[in-house]
Amino acid sequence: MNIGISQRVDLVRNERRDSLDQNWFRILKNFKLQILPIPNLLTNPIEWIENQKIEAFILSGGNDLSFFKKSNKKEVNECRDKLEILILRYCKKKKIPVIGICRGLQIINYFFNKKINLKKNIIHVNSKHNIYPNIQEKFRFFKEKK
């Protein structure tokens, strides 16, 4: 099964780079899924998605939503927001599963016109989050390939 995953944008040496934590591949290989990072600057994202035969999406974490931080261009990426909104429209129309992680869930919430409250003075980035060690046993989202 091909899973598309969005990428954060990092500013490194005056270059804007799409990036994805390598742990995504390490963790999801147990599900026998093909993980396809989605470039943020695709000319025709829908055509690319359909050519890749993507069957589900993960909207990953990282970066702030551009709706909240117009002044900080290092953290904000409007092209990522636009891409993820386009992905959500496509998923809704085609009934394709999508899950949001951290920022990804925030954009899903925004897409469905829900309220998002900006909290200040919360240390969250680069903090440790507990997860289930045997997550595959807890959830059976995908059919296992034999």
Where do the PLM segments sit?
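N-terminal beta1-alpha1 cap of cysteine-dependent amidohydrolase-like domains
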Residues: M1-R103, Y110, H124-K138, F142-K146
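Glycine-rich beta-alpha loop elements in corrinoid/cobalamin-binding modules
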Residues: N121
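Post-Walker A helix-loop "phosphate-sensing" segment adjacent to the P-loop in P-loop NTPases
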Residues: N113-L118
